[in-house]
Structures are given as C-alpha cells and as structure tokens.
Amino acid sequence: MGIVFNYIDPVAFNLGPLSVRWYGIIIAVGILLGYFVAQRALVKAGLHKDTLVDIIFYSALFGFIAARIYFVIFQWPYYAENPSEIIKIWHGGIAIHGGLIGGFIAGVIVCKVKNLNPFQIGDIVAPSIILAQGIGRWGNFMNHEAHGGSVSRAFLEQLHLPNFIIENMYINGQYYHPTFLYESIWDVAGFIILVNIRKHLKLGETFFLYLTWYSIGRFFIEGLRTDSLMLTSNIRVAQLVSILLILISISLIVYRRIKYNPPLYSKVGALPWPTKKVK
C-alpha cells in the first residue's frame, strides 16, 4: 500500500543548472488563462484590449513580492536567524493572502495612473483571479505541499479520486488530505458562479463577492492543513484574514445597497457607483 507507482517529480525539466518546476509552469498557465478570460470581459465592457497588460504585469510582480514578504513576516523567528534564506524563494515560502494584498495595491495604483475605474477593473478580473488560484493549487500538488492532516488510503479511495492523486498524497510514509484539490474545486466553482451572475450585480460587487467566496472556502480548508502560518498557537493567520475579508466585503456590499438603494437583484446589469466616469 505504501508504494507510489506514479510519483510526480516536482521538477519538470532542467536547463543546465536551472531546474524548471511544475509549480512555476502551472502558476504561469493559470495567469495566462485568467488573462484571456478577462480579455473577453474587457472587450464586452468597451475597453481597449491592452488595458489589462500593465495591470496584470505589475499586480503579478508586486503580488509575488508581497506574498514572499508576508510569509517571511509570519516566519520571522526562523528568518531572523537565517537572513540569507529570505531571498531564496526557490526553497519555498509564499502566501496567497500576501499576494492578494500586493496585487490589489499595485492594481489600484495602475488604475489611478491610467485614469481607470478600479471597481470596474476589479469586477472584470475577479473571476480570472479565482480561476488562476484554482489552477495554481495544482502546483502545490506537484510540490507535494500544502496538504492536510493524515488520513487512510481507504478514506481517499472513498472520495473516488484518480489513482495518481491518491498515490501522490502518500508523502513520507503517510497519506494526507488533498486540500489542494478541495480548494481547487471550490475556486473553480466560484469562477463559474461569478461569470454567470456578475451581469446582474452592481459595480464593485463581483470583486467583493469573489473575496467573500474565496475566504469562506479558505477558512474551512485552512483548518485541515498542517503547514499554516500561525499568529498564536491556536490562531491561524489565513483564517483570521479570511474572516476580516468576509466582514469587510459583505459590509461594503450592504452599505452600498442601503446608501444607493438599488434592487437586490437586477436584470439590467451592473450600474456604476457615483464616482468618476469610467473610461
């Protein structure tokens, strides 16, 4: 039972001394697919087809940097003793919430510079972000990381998972919860929901609902993981951040609904906030 017949090597191929890992390839595929999905929404919104290029570039760049900084902050006792490890990203260690924060800030700045409405852009890219996240979780699978607690092989078989997933959940002599798969399915479901209801939502609400949906799933799935960043011995950082994002997002939606009094559900489509003109 303990033999892995289809073990996946995290390294896809080597270019001389450089090892190209499946993790990086899958993340890149997720970003590219998300970009093409967002492009379709962009054209429907009447914006120039190149509008997202700078936004995605800077959001991805600063999101990656912020994801590393976020991870280092919550693992500071280790990095304080091993400062040379801070820049060794190839040893692992990024956090999606840090990436979201960095990407969000960069995206808003680019929107302001280009005189774009950040709420409209947020609505356009929200489904793409959660789709990319769902795809990116398979990079964790390839790295044999971000898994949950130990389970039996019988438990995994009861989930009717493909053998290659079951066999690669056998890590260091033990089977584990495939939390990467749980989150991937949750994210893809969120993508499907968002692309089907966003035309009935008001400006900004698609993005806020993305944050809410993702955070609900992350809160529960995080409770199964064994590699969580911890604020204290009992408080997981990702769960705390998820709760905050849920409260903030729902509060903003409710606040706008009360202040501007639009119908809860409209067949007309998204209407802009009373803000600067969308270009």
UniProtKB/Swiss-Prot annotation:
Coiled-coil annotated residue ranges, if any: none
GO molecular function: phosphatidylglycerol-prolipoprotein diacylglyceryl transferase activity
PROSITE patterns: LGT
Localization annotation: Cell membrane
The keyword Transmembrane helix is annotated on this UniProt entry: yes
Top-level taxon of the source organism: Bacteria
A Pfam family this chain is assigned to: LGT
Binding site for a 1,2-diacyl-sn-glycero-3-phospho-(1'-sn-glycerol): 137
Known function: Transfers the N-acyl diglyceride group on what will become the N-terminal cysteine of membrane lipoproteins.
Protein name in the entry: Phosphatidylglycerol--prolipoprotein diacylglyceryl transferase
UniProt organism field: Staphylococcus aureus (strain NCTC 8325 / PS 47)
Source lineage: Bacteria, Bacillati, Bacillota, Bacilli, Bacillales
Gene expressing this chain: lgt
